[in-house]
Amino acid sequence: MKFLTLALSATATAMIIVNPEQQPLAPSIVQNPQHKSLIELAPYRTRWVTEEEKWSLKLDGVNFIDVTDEYQSGSYGTLHTTRVVHYPGAMEHAHEILPLTETLDKSNMRSNLEHFTSFYTRYYKSQTGIESATWLFDQVTAAVHESGASDHGATVERFAHPWGQFSIIARIPGQTDNTVILGSHQDSINLFLPSILAAPGADDDGSGTVTILEALRALLRSETIAHGQARNTIEFHWYSAEEGGLLGSQAVYANYKKNQRNVKAMLQQDMTGYVQGTLDAGEKESVGVIIDYVDQGLTAFIKEVITTYCDVPYVETKCGYACSDHASASRYGYPSAFVIESQFENSDKRIHTTEDKIEYLSFDHMLQHAKMSLAFAYELAFAPF
């Protein structure tokens, strides 16, 4: 996530539409200065910055996408349109999903998060960032193998990046190539000195990482899913380098667009564990459904998922441009949505510091996000796109 830190702060049609937040054409860009990155602060509003200027912007709560690779490849400014996808108007698989939600285990999430935050930092350019990714890859691989899904075509892939820390993609094939994706980001950062200071990243985004890992484990308890008998393909993504400007997820979705991957829905889970800010504001526990820079049809569907399967309500909230990896999916023409732990203004202010620790998180609240993730994946696994 990119915002102010502590103290500094249902058949797809052939119709094509343009994301309402997108602008028509990119302006000209000043030639690349040496050792700088090109960032996009709003649609087609760019600036060349140093690495230090990147972190300064993040400390000031400024969102951005690092589009340097797009610029260097000559593809920056390409307008990727989004196909309209019709999502189910009602939940149709409660009989199968509710027993699966009973298998979600908070103790799994806690033990996984305790280990994940034990790495000194998961900064995407660090050695421990590679080590944490390797550990996570092993957990995802074990979940897939233990379910028997790998005997039916399920795979776990390391998606390589030039900075070292790789992204992780678990793919559970269905009967079609229509693909439903749940995402989180695995990297962490300490914005004061990213290469030196500790960054436990418990909430941002260790919480989302273990939330969708637990949803994957529960989902694969369905023999129908694990044996590849669902209508659609399901993927779980753990992106590298979100904190550097959505670098990992951009690379993934650029690859998917190049290879004409048929993505019907993408849901991001970034920060799922902090509820105290909501309670301190005198409000009831809820989850925050992002309503800006997202696909409105998919967002409406997710509201129905929450209402049906979660024990807490949702509230609508906004997080601005490029606030997490769902923006990369949208950028490449794939419908995406994002649900966060609370109203945006009540979310965790300890992120990007040494104080982003487990002790401040609620695993009961994370369980609500896991229920939502599980139900989202199962319902759309059988949607007649």
From Swiss-Prot:
Keyword Protease attributed: yes
Subcellular location: Secreted
Signal peptide start-end: 1-14
Source species, domain of life: Eukaryota
GO BP: any one term: proteolysis
Keyword DNA-binding listed: no
InterPro entries in alphabetical order: M28_fam, Peptidase_M28
Gene3D superfamilies: Zn peptidases
Enzyme class: hydrolase
EC number in record: 3.4.11.-
Entry keyword set: Aminopeptidase, Disulfide bond, Hydrolase, Metal-binding, Protease, Secreted, Signal, Zinc, Zymogen
Propeptide feature ranges: 15-85
Residue sites binding Zn(2+) 1 per the record: H185, D204, D270
Pfam family, one: Peptidase_M28
Cofactor note: Binds 2 Zn(2+) ions per subunit.
Residue numbers binding Zn(2+) 2: D204, E243, H352
GO MF terms held by the record: aminopeptidase activity; metal ion binding; metalloexopeptidase activity
GO cellular component labels: extracellular region
Family: Belongs to the peptidase M28 family. M28E subfamily.
Function: Extracellular aminopeptidase that allows assimilation of proteinaceous substrates.
Assembly information from the UniProt record: Monomer.
Stated name of the protein: Leucine aminopeptidase 1
Species this protein is from: Penicillium rubens (strain ATCC 28089 / DSM 1075 / NRRL 1951 / Wisconsin 54-1255) (Penicillium chrysogenum)
Phylogenetic lineage: Eukaryota, Fungi, Dikarya, Ascomycota, Pezizomycotina
